Design a protein with these regions (language model features):
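Auxiliary tRNA-acceptor-end handling modules of aminoacyl-tRNA synthetases
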Residues: 1-98, 116, 120, 131-218
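Zn2+-dependent metallopeptidase catalytic core
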Residues: 97-125
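Extended, hydrophobic alpha-helical segments in both membrane/secreted and soluble proteins
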Residues: 106-110, 214-219
């Protein structure tokens, strides 16, 4: 293929390529988090394990629920029904490269998740923070840090990969990637799915407050 085919969605063969790759390795806790069996009626991601037994000729698949390690800082108060902070809150670091008009919606989207966490007894369980500017150890490519990243390319989508402890299903990292043209996707969704009921989206330019709410939904 010619070099001019690059970026046009075509297969490229016999062309030189340079790729920068980050390898991130973390040490798991000696004692894994207590696993919880997945309930297929609840829409969460599972981790599968195969159980081998000398008493059976075949393996049995076990599915653990992928979940964060949220442990109460005040166990006694938690048992008594008080709302407590977790020992280790869930922290998402927000990319400083996002368009300014997106940032408020992203922070609000993360903080809104504190509402369901409060119903199970945790306050300040999840936090959104800006990329640290004065921490030389911070690296958004390090699995130690869950991040919400800005991808300045023309894909109309967002994605949220996660990495878990295979022994228990404990979520170790869950980063979110927002591609720049996710806004175009939201415009299409809003018009096609809601225009019949919402006259605000029956325009070429959808009002800012409607788009902000849609962006919170995606995050």
């Amino acid at each position: 293929r010619r070099s001019s085919d690059l970026g046009k969605g075509k297969d490229i063969k016999d062309e030189p390529l340079t790729a920068k790759v980050t390898r991130s390795i973390i040490l798991l806790d000696t004692i894994p988090y207590r696993p919880r069996l997945m309930d297929s009626r609840i829409g969460i991601f599972p981790t599968m394990k195969n159980e081998y037994s000398a008493a059976k000729q075949t393996t049995r698949s076990i599915y653990y629920a992928n979940r964060w390690r949220l442990e109460p800082s005040d166990l006694r108060g938690y048992i008594e029904g008080k709302k407590v902070t977790p020992i280790k809150p869930i922290v998402f670091y927000v990319d400083s490269c996002f368009p300014e008009s997106w940032k408020a919606s992203i922070f609000e989207a993360v903080n809104q998740w504190n509402e369901p966490f409060e119903k199970i007894g945790f306050t300040q369980a999840i936090q959104a923070k800006e990329f640290p500017k004065d921490d030389p150890e911070f690296d958004p490519d390090n699995l130690k840090y869950s991040c919400i990243r800005y991808a300045p390319i023309g894909i109309e989508n967002a994605m949220g990969p996660s990495w878990v402890d295979p022994r228990s299903g404990e979520i170790l990292n869950a980063s979110v990637y927002l591609y720049h043209n996710v806004i175009k996707l939201l415009n299409n969704w809003l018009f096609i799915q809601t225009a019949q009921a919402d006259k605000r989206v029956r325009h070429k330019v959808i009002p800012r407050e409607v788009m902000d709410d849609a962006l919170r939904y995606v995050v």
